[in-house]
Amino acid sequence: ANGGDVLEVQLVDKVLSPDGSVVMEKQPNITSHLDGVDASLSVIRQGMKGVISAEDGGTASEYFRNFDYTDQVGAKTGTAQVNLIDLENNAWFVAFAPYEEPEIAVVVFIANGYKGGVASLTSKDVIANYFERKNNPEIDEVPVQDSFVP
């Protein structure tokens, strides 16, 4: 979703103090670039937008029906077959948002999750939380030591 840049993995891009000042900020580090991506990228992105589109009958469209941010997400479902008795297939779902200028990517894997669309439910919640916090930064809570804020 970024034009072929391969970035170093990082979980946190910045840390803010309770008053909103930046305590630490880390810039993305490009480790390499995939050549030839530009020619195919628009077709791939269009296909990923169709995955959650009810209009296109996408494989995850039923899970994104009435989702406020559907037009701002690109995604792909995946099902990895399991050939053992009494086990269901593994479910994969990958998504990025915002669609035009991606800032986040979400990958969900559920062992024996049946099909990729099932994994999209978790991704949808993460994306909704991202947009709600981005659009309403005052809802952020600062956790006290040794606690967790969902």
Segments predicted by a language model, with ranges:
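Active-site beta-strand/loop architecture of penicillin-binding DD-peptidases
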Residues: 1-18, 22-30, 48, 52-137
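Short surface loop/edge beta-strand patches of beta-sandwich-type extracellular domains
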Residues: 28-38
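Short, highly charged C-terminal tails/helix-capping segments
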Residues: 137-150
